Amino acid sequence: TEIYTGEDIFPYTTLFRSIIVAVLTTIVTLGLLGGYSSKTVSAILGTAIGVVIAAVAAMAFGKAAGITGYNVSDIEALNYVGQNTKIKIGELLFAGIIISALGAVMDVGMSIASTIQEIYETDKTLSMKRLFVSGINVGRDMMGTMTNTLIFAYVGGAITTLVINYAYDLSYRQLANSYVIGIEIMQGLSGSLGVVLTVPITALIASFLAVRKK
């Protein structure tokens, strides 16, 4: 008789745990900042969904491009860790993407929720549709700036590796097809997608909860 463990049923345990940590961090952080009001609930839900979207996007991109956690530069040290612990080092790359995107997603979620709440407090006759449109209009500018923040942060973290590869006089084709570039693109796209989709999701939830309080 075969005995199945939780890891056999759901193999992405490290990734799942990182999502749980991100959600719990969001609940505690936003709760301490804004209290547990409808505004905070909107921000928490929007952030949680945005983080899950970033995780799914990273996994999908990694599978399509053949990128795993074993393609990072510190794989020798990580292999030693993996042999002596139960940590699944192949998922650490994607767990890191979730954690690194959390700050930007949380910032956008709270900003959109606060904006809609303030607009509604100013004019409580506004409909849910009007509040949603206002949230989208405000979030449109935030998408670009927060996406740039994520991309520059990822590039800055990998600048030494990029310079080393450039110093070896690799062709642009070799450089563009390297795992380093692929990982940076994956991080930027997945994190940016999480930020972009957090805006309409949070705006929808916040406008619904604001009107529902009447």
Which residues does each PLM region occupy?
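Helical hairpin unit composed of two closely spaced alpha helices linked by a short loop
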Residues: L102-I112, I116-L162, D169
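Hydrophobic alpha-helical membrane-insertion segments
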Residues: L45-G62, D141-G157
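Short helix-loop junctions at transmembrane helix boundaries
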Residues: G35, V56-L92, A158-G182
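Structural signature of hydrophobic alpha-helical transmembrane segments
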Residues: P11-L24
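Pore-lining and gate-forming transmembrane alpha-helices of multi-pass membrane transport proteins
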Residues: A43-V51, G82-Q83, I87-I99, T145, ...
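Hydrophobic transmembrane alpha-helices
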Residues: A48-V52, F61, L92-G109, V155
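Single conserved hydrophobic/aromatic residue that forms the stacking wall/gate
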Residues: E2-T14
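Hydrophobic alpha-helical transmembrane segments of membrane transport and translocation systems
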Residues: A153-V155, I159-K214
